[in-house]
């Protein structure tokens, strides 16, 4: 079993909250192409992607699931990798509960994303 398949339940659970923007296959293809990165842990995983803005590059946590402490541990490795790729910031999109959980880890809320069907 590959790491991606082992992490599939966490990825699919996170996708259920992602606004129906991607399927598991989309994520698998993104990882295979190098446009997304898989950060596996024994009891969780995260998926990141680099976002290039005119003034900076961000390593964006696109999906995360599993045990919170393991997710916190893996962000250190992801941040180091992101710095090596020229990123100056790490961002995350997720449910509102992440704000409370991440504040103690030095994260701050800089914007809110809202959605309306059209």
Regions found by a protein language model. Name each.
Residues 1-22:
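Short amphipathic alpha-helix that is part of the acyltransferase structural core
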Residues 32-69:
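Conserved donor-binding loop and adjoining core beta-sheet/short helix segment
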